[in-house]
């Protein structure tokens, strides 16, 4: 692919990101838009970098969630901290152990931001429960409905 073609792919990044949001899969997005995986991945990385550069350390998050997502077969996970209000991902860490939760909470939010969180929603994974009480001592801890309904 020539430079001008690649610039066109990046210029139409919104379409790529919108398609990624719908498919939740880089390979499917590449196929649908007739792009290479590398092109889709580059657009995604640029969007993430742009979002991180816009992050405001003074922004307050009243309600946050800790959750995990399987990324491969065989119980390989990433842990995610996100804003419960709008679903914005604040941080992602490899694994779902205590160290992963510590990385999520201390890297994504300042001490002041964590002190102002009012509620933390988790599933029943022990590391998330421990993280909710350790890193958000002023917040109420709750479980989402998905995990409470039997």
Name what the model sees in each region.
Residues 19-21:
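Short amphipathic helical patch at the helix-1/turn junction of helix-turn-helix
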Residues 23-25:
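Residue-level signal for the short linker/turn that defines the boundary of a DNA-recognition helix
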Residues 27-43:
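Short, basic interhelical loop/turn and adjoining N-cap
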Residues 138-150:
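Inter-helix linker motif
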């Amino acid at each position: 692919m020539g430079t001008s073609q690649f610039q066109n792919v990046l210029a139409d990044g919104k379409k790529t990101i919108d398609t990624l949001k719908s498919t939740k899969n880089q390979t499917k997005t590449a196929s649908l838009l007739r792009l290479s995986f590398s092109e889709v991945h580059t657009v995604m990385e640029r969007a993430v970098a742009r979002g991180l550069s816009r992050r405001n350390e003074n922004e307050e998050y009243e309600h946050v969630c800790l959750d995990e997502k399987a990324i491969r077969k065989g119980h390989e996970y990433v842990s995610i901290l996100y804003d419960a209000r709008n679903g914005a991902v604040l941080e992602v860490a490899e694994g779902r152990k205590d160290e992963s939760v510590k990385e999520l909470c201390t890297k994504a939010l300042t001490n002041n931001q964590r002190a102002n969180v009012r509620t933390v929603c988790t599933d029943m994974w022990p590391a998330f429960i421990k993280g909710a009480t350790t890193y958000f001592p002023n917040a109420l801890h709750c479980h989402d409905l998905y995990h409470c309904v039997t």
